[in-house]
Amino acid sequence: MEYKFSTVVDPGTYETHGLCEGYEVRYHKNAELEDIGCLRCQEHWRQSVGPLGAFKGTLGNPFNLLSLVIPECLPDRLSIVGFANELAFIHDDVTDIVQYGDAHNNDFKEAFNSMATTGSMENAASGKRALQAYIAREMVRIDKERAIPTIKAWAKFVDYGGRQETTRFTSEKEYTEYRIQDIGLWFWYGLLSFAMALDVPEHEREMCHEVCRTAYVQIMLVHDLASWEKEKLNAAALGKDVITNIIFVLMEEHGISEEEAKERCRETAKTLAADYLKIVEEYKARDDISLDSRKYIESWLYTISGNTVWSFICPRYNSSGSFSDHQLELMKNGVPKDPASGSTNGTSNGTSNGTSHVAVNGNGHVTNDDLSANGIKTDGELLSAITMEHLKNRNSFKLGDHDQEVKSLHGHGQALDPRVLQAPYEYITALPSKGLREQAIDALNVWFRVPTAKLEIIKSITTILHNASLMLDDVEDGSELRRGKPATHNIFGLGQTINSANYQLVRALQELQKLGDARSLLVFTEELHNLYVGQSMDLYWTSNLVCPSMHEYFQMIEHKTGGLFRLFGRLMAVHSTNPVQVDLTDFTNHLGRYFQTRDDYQNLVSAEYTKQKGFCEDFEEGKFSLPMIHLMQTMPDNLVLRNVWTQRRVNGTATHGQKQTILNLMKEAGTLKFTQDSLGVLYSDVEKSVAELESKFGIENFQLRLIMELLKTG
C-alpha cells in the first residue's frame, strides 16, 4: 500500500502492552483537521440537542483515534470523517442509557435509511437529524458516488448496534458474535472506504468482512480491556447489574476473577493480532481479488495498532489522559469557519463567534461542561420559548359547510362513486417519484417551524397540484411516457385525464380550507394564477413557432416552475412559528430557474431521463427550452434547423433521426457547453440565496444544502 498522507510513529513514543507485536504505527500528517471535525460535532450536538455532560470522544494527546486507525485518510475527508466518527461515539454513549437507547437507535436508523434511499430526511430540523444531514451533505459534496453506499452501511450498523446493552450473555462466543456487529462492522466499512476512496466490488465485500473478522475481534478485546474501569463505573451509576464487556462475560461464564479474565483477554488479543499479520501477508500476494479489496484488508493493520495505542492514552478511558494545546485552544475559542458554509461550526446561533466554551485547567483536562453561557438552549428550552402565533379574524374566510357527509343528491339515489374520477390521479401518484418538493418543504421547515398538522396539509396541497399539473402537461405536450411508464392520458384517455386533473384543484382547495385563514387563500390563488400564465406562454410559443428571448423564457419559468415552489414557501411563511419573517421569493425564483434548466439539460444528455421520458423528448414536443433558444439564436439562418423544426410542427412529432440532427447541431453550436455553464451560474445564484436566508434566519440549513448537492450537475 502506498503511503502519502501519514508518517511512521517512533515506537519509543507509545505503548502497545504487547497486544500487537510486529505492527507499525502511522499517524496522519494533518491530524489537526480531525480536531476540527470532532469538536465541530460536539458543538453541533450541544447547540442542536443539548449538553454532553462529561463526554470525552476520540481526541487525545499526543494521538487522536482516527488519525491513527485510518492514517491514509484523504485530507479533504478527514474533518467530516472525524465528525461522523465522533457522532458514532456520542451515539454509543446515548444508547448505553437503556431508557433512551432504542428510541435513539430507531431515529438514527430511520434518518440514515431515508438519506440513502431518497437523499433527504423528514424532521431535519430536529437536533440529531440536523447533525446527520450535515454529515450527508458534506460527504455528498466531496464524493457523491461513495457517500450513498457509506450511508447505507451506517443504517445497517445502527439497526444492530446497541440493542443488547442489557443482555446477560452466557458465553464468550455469543458475546463475540454480537460485538462483531456492535463494534461497527458496517459502520467501519463505510467510514474506511469513504475516507480512503476505496471501491470494494460488491461481490467481494462479504469476503472482506469474513477475512477481517480476526481484526474485528482483536479490536473488540482491546476496547473492552481499556474501557473496563469506565464501564464498571457507568454500570454502577445507572444501577445496572450487567456490564456489556468481555471481562464481565468471562468472569460469569468461567467463574474466574477480574484479573484472570483480563489476562485471558490479553492473551487472546495477542494471538489474534499475530494471526492477522499472517492473513494480510497471504492476501497481499493474491492477484485474484481487486486492488481495493487488498487495500481494505491491509488497512486494518493500522486499525489494530492505532486502536491499541489510542485506547490506553485517551481521555475517554483514562483519567490521566489529556488534550493537546491545539485542541484546548479550539475548545476555548471555537473551531474555525466551515469552508463549505462560511459559519464557525456549521450552525449559526446568534452569538458573536458561534462557539461553545468549555473550561479547561492548566494540565489539559476538561473541568466544566456547562454550556449555558453562550446562550444556546436545548431542544426542550427552544420548544418552551416558541410562542404559537395564530392569525386573527379567521371568520372572514369560509368557503362553506363541509361538516355534513353527502349521502344523496336532492334526496334521490345514492351519491356517485368518486373512484372513477380519482383513478387517473391515483395512477400518476403511484408512479415512482423522488419527492423533491416534499423534501424541500421538510428542509424549509428547519427555518419556519410550521406545526406538524399544518405542514402535512401544505405537503398535501403541493403534491395534489404538482401531480395534476403533470397530468395536464402530458396531455398538452403529447407526452408518451411519465417516469418510465405510459403517460396518464395514454391509459385513461384525454377526457378522463383532463377531468380528473381539473378536479384536483377542488381537492387542493378543500385541503387549503383546513388551514383556516384568508392569507393562505390569497397565496393559493395568486400562485395558481402565475402557474397557468406561465404554462400558457410555453404552449403559445410551441404552437406558433415563436422563439422567445432568454429573458422571456426565464420569466415563464418563474411563473410556471417557480410558482409551485413559491406556493409552498409562502404558505409555510404564513403558518411559521418562527418570529423571524423572511421573504423567500428570490430563493424560489432562483430554484425554479435552476431546476427547469437542469431538466432541459438532462433531457438531452441523461440516459436515465431517456429511459423515463424518451430520447430528447423536448424536441418531439417542440418546446423552446433554454438549449433550443440558444441554438436558434446561434444559428438563425440554418435552413436544416428551421426545416426540421417546421416539419415537427406540421407532423405533430419528430422522428429519431430528426431529433438526432438537432442534437448534432447543438453540439456543433456549443449549446450543451453553454447550458452546462448556465447551470453553474444558476446553481451559484441558488447557493447565494440559501446563504442569505441562513444569515437572516440565523440557522444553517444542512438538509437544504444536501438537496442542492444531490441536484448538482457535473
Curated annotation (Swiss-Prot):
<feature type="binding site">
    <location>
        <position position="596"/>
    </location>
    <ligand>
        <name>dimethylallyl diphosphate</name>
    </ligand>
</feature>
<dbReference type="GO" id="GO:0016114">
    <property type="term" value="P:terpenoid biosynthetic process"/>
</dbReference>
<feature type="binding site">
    <location>
        <position position="561"/>
    </location>
    <ligand>
        <name>dimethylallyl diphosphate</name>
    </ligand>
</feature>
<feature type="binding site">
    <location>
        <position position="96"/>
    </location>
    <ligand>
        <name>Mg(2+) 1</name>
    </ligand>
</feature>
<feature type="binding site">
    <location>
        <position position="477"/>
    </location>
    <ligand>
        <name>Mg(2+) 4</name>
    </ligand>
</feature>
<feature type="short sequence motif" description="NSE motif">
    <location>
        <begin position="276"/>
        <end position="284"/>
    </location>
</feature>
<feature type="short sequence motif" description="DDXXD motif 2">
    <location>
        <begin position="473"/>
        <end position="477"/>
    </location>
</feature>
<feature type="binding site">
    <location>
        <position position="473"/>
    </location>
    <ligand>
        <name>Mg(2+) 3</name>
    </ligand>
</feature>
<dbReference type="Pfam" id="PF19086">
    <property type="entry name" value="Terpene_syn_C_2"/>
</dbReference>
<feature type="compositionally biased region" description="Low complexity">
    <location>
        <begin position="341"/>
        <end position="356"/>
    </location>
</feature>
<dbReference type="Pfam" id="PF00348">
    <property type="entry name" value="polyprenyl_synt"/>
</dbReference>
<feature type="binding site">
    <location>
        <position position="623"/>
    </location>
    <ligand>
        <name>dimethylallyl diphosphate</name>
    </ligand>
</feature>
<dbReference type="GO" id="GO:0004659">
    <property type="term" value="F:prenyltransferase activity"/>
</dbReference>
<feature type="binding site">
    <location>
        <position position="613"/>
    </location>
    <ligand>
        <name>dimethylallyl diphosphate</name>
    </ligand>
</feature>
<dbReference type="InterPro" id="IPR008949">
    <property type="entry name" value="Isoprenoid_synthase_dom_sf"/>
</dbReference>
<feature type="binding site">
    <location>
        <position position="482"/>
    </location>
    <ligand>
        <name>dimethylallyl diphosphate</name>
    </ligand>
</feature>
<feature type="short sequence motif" description="DDXXD motif 1">
    <location>
        <begin position="92"/>
        <end position="96"/>
    </location>
</feature>
<feature type="binding site">
    <location>
        <position position="92"/>
    </location>
    <ligand>
        <name>Mg(2+) 1</name>
    </ligand>
</feature>
<feature type="region of interest" description="Geranylgeranyl diphosphate synthase">
    <location>
        <begin position="326"/>
        <end position="713"/>
    </location>
</feature>
<feature type="binding site">
    <location>
        <position position="473"/>
    </location>
    <ligand>
        <name>Mg(2+) 4</name>
    </ligand>
</feature>
<feature type="region of interest" description="Disordered">
    <location>
        <begin position="332"/>
        <end position="356"/>
    </location>
</feature>
<comment type="pathway">
    <text>Secondary metabolite biosynthesis; terpenoid biosynthesis.</text>
</comment>
<feature type="binding site">
    <location>
        <position position="96"/>
    </location>
    <ligand>
        <name>Mg(2+) 2</name>
    </ligand>
</feature>
<keyword id="KW-0479">Metal-binding</keyword>
<comment type="similarity">
    <text>In the N-terminal section; belongs to the terpene synthase family.</text>
</comment>
<comment type="subunit">
    <text>Hexamer.</text>
</comment>
<keyword id="KW-0677">Repeat</keyword>
<keyword id="KW-0456">Lyase</keyword>
<comment type="function">
    <text>Multifunctional diterpene synthase; part of the gene cluster that mediates the biosynthesis of the sesterterpene stellatic acid. The first step in the pathway is performed by the stellatatriene synthase that possesses both prenyl transferase and terpene cyclase activity, converting isopentenyl diphosphate and dimethylallyl diphosphate into geranylgeranyl diphosphate (GGDP) and then converting GGDP into stellata-2,6,19-triene. The cytochrome P450 monooxygenase Stl-P450 then catalyzes three successive oxidation reactions on the C-20 methyl group to generate the carboxylic acid of stellatic acid.</text>
</comment>
<feature type="region of interest" description="stellata-2,6,19-trien synthase">
    <location>
        <begin position="1"/>
        <end position="325"/>
    </location>
</feature>
<keyword id="KW-0511">Multifunctional enzyme</keyword>
<dbReference type="GO" id="GO:0043386">
    <property type="term" value="P:mycotoxin biosynthetic process"/>
</dbReference>
<comment type="similarity">
    <text>In the C-terminal section; belongs to the FPP/GGPP synthase family.</text>
</comment>
<feature type="binding site">
    <location>
        <position position="483"/>
    </location>
    <ligand>
        <name>isopentenyl diphosphate</name>
    </ligand>
</feature>
<dbReference type="InterPro" id="IPR000092">
    <property type="entry name" value="Polyprenyl_synt"/>
</dbReference>
<feature type="binding site">
    <location>
        <position position="477"/>
    </location>
    <ligand>
        <name>Mg(2+) 3</name>
    </ligand>
</feature>
<protein>
    <recommendedName>
        <fullName>Stellatatriene synthase</fullName>
        <ecNumber>2.5.1.-</ecNumber>
        <ecNumber>4.2.3.178</ecNumber>
    </recommendedName>
</protein>
<dbReference type="GO" id="GO:0046872">
    <property type="term" value="F:metal ion binding"/>
</dbReference>
<feature type="binding site">
    <location>
        <position position="434"/>
    </location>
    <ligand>
        <name>isopentenyl diphosphate</name>
    </ligand>
</feature>
<feature type="binding site">
    <location>
        <position position="560"/>
    </location>
    <ligand>
        <name>dimethylallyl diphosphate</name>
    </ligand>
</feature>
<feature type="binding site">
    <location>
        <position position="603"/>
    </location>
    <ligand>
        <name>dimethylallyl diphosphate</name>
    </ligand>
</feature>
<keyword id="KW-0460">Magnesium</keyword>
